[in-house]
Amino acid sequence: MRSLLLLTVLAALVVAILCYESHESMESYEINPFINRRNANTFMSPQQRWMAKAQERVREQRKPAYELNREACDDYKLCERYAMVYGYNAAYNRYFRQRRRAE
């Protein structure tokens, strides 16, 4: 009985130590995580924004075939479900390649 009481007190002490919330963990609540648009736009200069948009356009134009197939499959719910089980390549072959052969 005495060992059970000692074990309970020890467990309560461990829980209290692990659940203790220090002052450092409260710092994130003090600062507002949202900033206004004017301050948000100061992070990137217009030149950097233009470069980022240009790079994104290049990436969109030069996507590999498997990425295009995956995007087509993501837009069709049945294909997406089939892909979760058998993979995107098998799902694309089942739902889109057969249609092209039939036409």
Swiss-Prot record:
Requires vitamin K-dependent gamma-carboxylation for its function. GO terms for biological process: cartilage development; cell differentiation; ossification; regulation of bone mineralization. GO terms for cellular component: extracellular matrix; extracellular region. Disulfide bonds join 73-79. Keywords: Chondrogenesis, Developmental protein, Differentiation, Disulfide bond, Gamma-carboxyglutamic acid, Osteogenesis, Phosphoprotein, Secreted, Signal. It comes from the Eukaryota. Its main location: secreted. InterPro entries: GLA-like_dom_SF, GLA_domain, MGP, Osteocalcin/MGP. The keyword Phosphoprotein applies. GO terms for molecular function: calcium ion binding. The modification 4-carboxyglutamate is found at residues 21, 56, 60, 67, 71. Residues 51-97 form the Gla domain. It is found in: Secreted. Residues 1-19 form the signal peptide. The keyword Cell inner membrane does not apply. The modification Phosphoserine is found at residues 22, 25, 28. Belongs to the osteocalcin/matrix Gla protein family. Associates with the organic matrix of bone and cartilage. Thought to act as an inhibitor of bone formation. This is Matrix Gla protein.
